Swiss-Prot record:
Keywords: Ribonucleoprotein, Ribosomal protein. It comes from Clostridium botulinum (strain Alaska E43 / Type E3). InterPro entries: Ribosomal_uS2, Ribosomal_uS2_bac/mit/plastid, Ribosomal_uS2_CS, Ribosomal_uS2_flav_dom_sf. This is Small ribosomal subunit protein uS2. It comes from the Bacteria. PANTHER family: 30S RIBOSOMAL PROTEIN S2 PROKARYOTIC AND ORGANELLAR, SMALL RIBOSOMAL SUBUNIT PROTEIN US2M. The gene is rpsB. Belongs to the universal ribosomal protein uS2 family. GO terms for molecular function: structural constituent of ribosome. One of its GO terms (cellular component) is cytosolic small ribosomal subunit. One of its GO terms (biological process) is translation. It holds the Pfam family Ribosomal_S2. HAMAP family: Ribosomal_uS2_B.
C-alpha cells in the first residue's frame, strides 16, 4: 500500500500543473497530458516519487537527523509551519535570509537577540521600561519571530534534509543546502527545474490543499522515523 493514494492526490488537485506556456521542458517526463492550456501531472509518478521521498525522510529521521521545512509563498506558509511543529522540526515560512545556513554564526546572533527580548518580556523587564522603548522592542521581537522563530533551536550540523515547496521560489535556500551537501526533497511543479532537487515530488505547488497533503506526509515520515529511532535505543 502506497503512502499516498491517487484518490487523495486527485481530491487535493495535485495533478494541476501550470499553463503550458509557463513550463520547464525538463518536467516533460512527469507530465501526463495537456488540458485547456494547463499541463496535467502524471499522478502515478507522483505516487511513486512521494513514496521514495517518504522513505528517505523516514530514514533521515531514524538516524536522529533534523529536517528543515522551507516554504515562503502564501499558499505554503501555514502548512510548512503547522507540519514542522507537529513533527517537532524546524521551518522557514516568511523569508529566506541570505546565509541562513551558510553563514549560520551571524544568524545565531539574531536568534540570541530574539531569545533575549523574549526573556525581557517574560521576566517583567517590559513593565519597568519606558513605553516608547517597549513598543520598539515589541516591533523588533515581532520581526525576529517572523523570520527566525522556526529555527530558534536549529543545529545547523544536524540537518539531514531540506523539504521545499516550490524550488523556483526557494532557489537561494536550495543553493545553500547544496553548498553544505544537504539533500533536498521538494514539491516540483511543471514550471520548475527537477535537476535542482534530489527527491522530486511532481505536483501542484500553488493549491493550499495539495501543499498541505504532501507536507503532512513528510511530517508523518519524520514521526514514523523517530519511533524507529526510539525503538532502536
Amino acid at each position: 500500500m502506497s503512502v499516498i493514494s491517487m484518490k487523495q492526490l486527485l481530491e487535493a488537485g495535485v495533478h494541476f500543473g501550470h499553463q503550458t506556456r509557463r513550463w520547464n521542458p525538463k518536467m516533460a517526463p512527469y507530465i501526463f497530458t495537456e488540458r485547456n492550456g494547463i499541463y496535467i501531472i502524471d499522478l502515478q509518478k507522483t505516487v511513486r516519487k512521494a513514496e521514495e521521498a517518504y522513505n528517505f525522510i523516514k530514514e533521515v529521521s531514524t538516524e536522529g537527523k533534523d529536517i528543515l521545512f522551507v516554504g515562503t509563498k502564501k499558499q505554503a506558509q501555514d502548512a510548512i509551519k503547522d507540519e514542522a511543529i507537529r513533527s517537532s522540526m524546524h521551518f522557514v515560512n516568511n523569508r529566506w535570509l541570505g546565509g541562513m545556513l551558510t553563514n549560520f554564526s551571524t544568524i545565531k546572533k539574531r536568534i540570541r537577540r530574539l531569545s533575549e527580548i523574549e526573556r525581557m518580556q517574560e521576566d517583567g523587564t517590559f513593565e519597568v521600561l519606558p513605553k516608547k522603548e517597549v513598543i520598539k522592542l515589541k516591533g523588533e521581537l515581532e520581526k525576529l519571530e517572523k523570520n527566525l522563530g522556526g529555527i530558534k533551536n536549529l543545529d545547523c550540523d544536524n540537518i539531514g534534509a531540506m523539504f521545499v515547496v516550490d524550488p523556483r521560489k526557494e532557489k537561494n535556500a536550495i543553493s545553500e543546502a547544496k553548498i553544505l551537501g544537504i539533500p533536498v526533497v521538494a514539491i516540483v511543479d511543471t514550471n520548475c527545474d527537477p535537476e535542482e532537487v534530489d527527491y522530486v515530488i511532481p505536483g501542484n505547488d500553488d493549491a493550499i490543499r495539495a501543499v498541505k497533503l504532501i507536507t503532512a506526509k513528510m511530517a508523518d515520515a519524520i514521526m514514523e522515523g523517530r519511533q524507529g529511532e526510539e525503538l532502536a535505543e
